[in-house]
Amino acid sequence: MEYKNYTAYQHGSEPAVGVLITNLGTPDAPTKEALRPYLKEFLMDPRVVEPPPARWLWKLILNLIILNTRPAKSAEAYQEVWGKYGDGSPLLDISNRQLMDIEEKVRAHFSGRVEFALGMRYGNPSIASALKSLQDRNVQRLIVVPLYPQYAGATTASTFDAVSAELQQWRWIPELRFVRNYHKHPGYIKALANSIREHQAEHGKPDLLVMSYHGIPQRYFDNGDPYPCECRATSRLVAEELGLNSDEYMVTFQSLFGKEEWVKPYTDATLKSLPDKGVKHLQVICPGFSADCLETIEEIDQENREYFEEAGGEKFSYIPALNDRDDHTTALTQIILQQTRGWPERDGFDAEADKEERALQAKLADQLEKKLSDEFGQ
């Protein structure tokens, strides 16, 4: 492997802590031309689609069939949500606001230099480009915060893969901490409960609260992925915070892809069946999505709303993702602060004394270099 050279080490350069916030990603535009490379990158990730041993067959299906049919359909869906939370993709617009809020809150607890970047697993800005921007700012300690509350191989582990792939090419890697999950973090649970209470204060209490999470193939769970268990743990804690009985809420899984069995129950099939079971007023929240995106805005609030109403449901409302709510970004800040304990740039760090020490070390290094040069030549 060839390592990417940066610059020669400079004595006295000011180091920084880097905070890398990541999420899944988004196409550059709501067009089939932009969707094709985005979907290809996504569906070629072996963490997302674990194909049979004949991987060449999956590549053939992907390139000859899926990438010639799905981009146009996906582009139409993205056009429905584009600009809803800003000028472009909802996920990217919200993620940028989250980053700004987190940065402001985290900086208050750092006396040393701390730098921030946003990276998407697929599309732009990429994780690689975000890491390079942190490298340019002399980041020597790095915390990676994937905004996936529940761990899954297809999301969290894939993020780790992307971070590792870039850092493997660096000659000097930073000290690294990686947030694996936060599905039971008290601040996250309280933020979810607060959002539900606020929604119900305006829209009333439903017959049933559905907590819908992105699904994974049953095969992944059978092979050891803890994701469904962590989804159910989150839901149980939120229900306890709200004082809900077990018959007042349920957990479902959405966004199925392909023909194999995924973890159940499925969100769409569930919503179609609920009116016949007496559920006329339904509220849905998606706790696993840290920001609203195509899967929540279009799939839940539009498509699944129609399923419920066409089956006889009378009142449906979607409870938005936590997005850039203050209690959400506060919870994420708490997670970052907990994970960076012990780093010298944190609270109590004497930045001026550190600057003086670095200047002294640089001066001594220059003196030594001059002495060696005088004695031994170039």
From Swiss-Prot:
It comes from the Bacteria. Coiled coil: none annotated. Keywords: Cytoplasm, Heme biosynthesis, Iron, Lyase, Metal-binding, Porphyrin biosynthesis. It catalyses: heme b + 2 H(+) = protoporphyrin IX + Fe(2+). GO terms for cellular component: cytoplasm. Pathway: Porphyrin-containing compound metabolism; protoheme biosynthesis; protoheme from protoporphyrin-IX: step 1/1. The keyword Iron applies. PANTHER family: FERROCHELATASE, FERROCHELATASE, MITOCHONDRIAL. This is Ferrochelatase. It comes from Hydrogenovibrio crunogenus (strain DSM 25203 / XCL-2) (Thiomicrospira crunogena).
